[in-house]
UniProtKB/Swiss-Prot annotation:
Its main location: cytoplasm. It is an enzyme of class 2 (transferase). One of its GO terms (cellular component) is cytoplasm. One of its GO terms (biological process) is keto-3-deoxy-D-manno-octulosonic acid biosynthetic process. It catalyses: D-arabinose 5-phosphate + phosphoenolpyruvate + H2O = 3-deoxy-alpha-D-manno-2-octulosonate-8-phosphate + phosphate. It is found in: Cytoplasm. It comes from the Bacteria. GO terms for molecular function: 3-deoxy-8-phosphooctulonate synthase activity. Keywords: Cytoplasm, Lipopolysaccharide biosynthesis, Transferase. Pfam families: DAHP_synth_1 (PF00793). The gene is kdsA. It comes from Albidiferax ferrireducens (strain ATCC BAA-621 / DSM 15236 / T118) (Rhodoferax ferrireducens). The keyword Transferase applies. This is 2-dehydro-3-deoxyphosphooctonate aldolase.
Amino acid sequence: MKLCGFEVGLNQPLFLIAGPCVIESEQLQMDTAGTLKEITASLGIAFIFKSSFDKANRSSGSTFRGPGIERGLEILAKVKRELGVPILTDIHSEDQIAQVASVVDVLQTPAFLCRQTDFIRAVAQSGLPVNIKKGQFLAPGDMKNVIDKARAAAREKGLNEDNFMACERGVSFGYNNLVSDMRSLAIMRDTGAPVVFDATHSVQLPGGQGTSSGGQREMVPVLARAAVAVGVAGLFMETHPDPSKALSDGPNAVPLKHMRALLETLVALDAVTKKNGFLENSFAA
């Protein structure tokens, strides 16, 4: 798959989608994106900056959601223009698609909306690449139906059918908990789409703090290493200069100061994992 000028897939080096969970301020976005650009460039990692203008699925209606679509897109456009990095952001309704697609390079659909057929079709017909997140309630094999819906919608408009990624972000395991079944990363390859692993939302404890979600950020490196060892096209990781002060998802954000060391390990592991290909299909009965 061609994505923002580079190729992604199991036969390509690992790429990274990273940034703060939500747009807190213009300065935070510029500083974080600049640091990530420097780190990824030095490590030879293709990089897409992400952040949200609106967190529409917060645990509580009283918590910070973001600057909104108008101001949020202004800030993302500045990051793109001044730093020269491609931008990903998520959308939550069909009426946002055209406006957001005019600014960003990649769209993302929330995990909760992966079964909303009309929404998936509308996003697919934007013409932009789309990172489609698997719902916390969905079996990995069911993502093929979701990707097929997107491809069919693109085909109807004469658009690129190979413009979609399948993103794993954990599965609900009882109340206020998620687990990551690493088999899902191999199963989701059957969609024919590049598979991305969301290493930060996978350690989230949804609603675990009453009016906000908790998280186990110390487990991000553990799951990220495991996913890269299985073999994925890319990683999604939210990061913040000071997660303890982040306005959204701080408990599962990677401290920005540790991002370089983590990525150095993951790049080395990715090279080993992909060096000799994958034997899974040969092992099938």
